[in-house]
């Protein structure tokens, strides 16, 4: 069964890959993005990869009137909500900006969805809500111990969604917590290309590989690992996109 899905932040790293996978699965897609951390060129690449047209609206998800217009013009059946700011360090320096953007966009979106009678949403949360876990691997029941404003905005959005669904069983909500997505579409035409200074490790590595940076500094030599440097787990962005499709 095909549906028309609204993707907020759909021009971004995970959103663009998810848009391709949705269209490959036969769904129709509408993307809303303010392009604050993505490029307009990504839209043409999404269309070329999927071999299908989709609708794009350049708008901030905090703009309720813009969302109302989208829902009025398209028979949206569900929403995947990626839009938001995501840099941990930046959130510590600019907490109010993060609360305004991440909470404001979620609240405005939910209100617009309710007005339109669209009550299916997949929310892009983060494993940041677990803070520094005492045991690994992390499970859904692991203790939540947020350590930064970014993670706190994600957890607060989760709480909003839980309270909303508890108050109105017509809502269908899926919350996905993940971290460290890497990789790119097999074509290489879309991947992680953030505007400005990257917030993740892999873009720095690729910039060194292609000569945009001379070197990459590795910090820390006393971790409990064979060589003392840090170790991280990663998830491929296409696998993550397929997870959103399944949700």
Where are these regions (language model features)?
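N-terminal Rossmann-like NAD(P)+-binding domain of SDR-like oxidoreductases, especially those catalyzing
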Residues: 1-184
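NAD(P)-dependent short-chain dehydrogenase/reductase
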Residues: 162-245
